[in-house]
Amino acid sequence: MKVLVVGGGGREHAIVQKLRESREITALYCAPGNGGIARDAVCVPIKATDVEAIADWAAAEKMDYVVVTPDDPLCLGLVDLLAARGIPAFGPDRAAARIEGSKVFAKDLMRRYGIPTARYETFDDVEAALAYVRTAPCPVVVKADGLALGKGVLICETNAQAEEAVTEMMRHGKFGASGSRVVVEAFLEGPEVSVLCFTDGTAIRPMAASMDHKRALDGDRGLNTGGMGVIAPNPYYTPEVAARCMEEIFLPTLAAMRAEGCPFHGCLYFGLMITRDGPKVIEYNCRFGDPETQAVLPLMESDLLTVMRATTEGTLSQADVRFRDGASCCVVLASGGYPEKYETGKPIAGLAEAEKTARVYHAGTKALEDGTLVTSGGRVLGVTAVADDLPAAIRLAYEAADHIRFDGLHRREDIGARALRALG
């Protein structure tokens, strides 16, 4: 089979490497890919958001299957364009991708179908939003309705901070059209759990639960990022919690999407908070998480392509979906200044040493004509180690990461610390 993966980050590198294990694949491509992915697949220089060009290329090159993982092309309807050309794809169509593409759609869906989530209000008028947040009990969470690279969620400790967040989004256009509507919701307390699930719209198969570390600095301080590291499995996702999530959240969400006329197939990501009242949904994503994927897929024992095709063909209930015992830890190495302004073009050293004991997934890297690998993004690399237990996985990931050097390198030093405390 000829398979195309759409995207160019660390998540796509992890997916490409896992797909390489499949005996069915005869040719593997990635659009646009990056400097590391180029070692594992043929990179095609088309932006992931240029959905018409990708669909045309896939048809011209007779792709047998396309894996669409970034949120933008999913919300722009790439899966629909591929279907119109007779090409099966992994991922939801445009209508189903609204579960991530619009937080208003997602919150209203949960309210209509009784899926547990935080209390909230939605606003498309800036003055009404400002009037509400001036007196709302704090802390409060202000969310841009649309896609914002994982940075459109602001936790506001005071009413003044909430007013500033609303003003920046709705009046000053911080996130463009994505912030023209906002969701203002109650702040939930408890440990966070990320659960990626394969689904064909009816059957659902959760992957190993993980714990993301979204803040830029140690101790969960600093700005929200796309994610600075992940551990799996998540110790807060106990068998009891998992059973409640399946009954109260996972299956009802799939049923709700079917009832709305937009059944979801692909990877559905549940961002959960384990509160004193039980698990509640913080957010849905319509695709694999980044960097959760870089920690979860190394634990997967099944053939990834076979499982993906089962979600497309509606046969997931018969698919073999297995994850090994043990644990994994992914430490993200970022450019100094991320998630705000940062410099690129910094030469990267030490990869060969790191790769002796860990997987190194490339996110923001580029290969120059002379073969030199340089930084090209905010999150540059993800270093993942797998071991029999979590303490060993964390130690191995940091030991491998210590070998890697580039000017301005920033990382968190406490990935997995909260999970270790939970384990005692």
PLM feature segments, named:
Residues 1-95:
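ATP-binding N-terminal substructure of ATP-dependent carboxylate-amine bond-forming enzymes
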Residues 43-49, 121-125, 156:
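Short acidic-hydrophobic, aromatic-tinged amphipathic segments that line or gate anion-handling sites
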Residues 152-293:
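Internal nucleotide-binding/catalytic subdomain
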Residues 246-268, 285-357, 368:
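Active-site "cap" helix and flanking loop/linker of ATP-utilizing ligase/carboxylase catalytic domains
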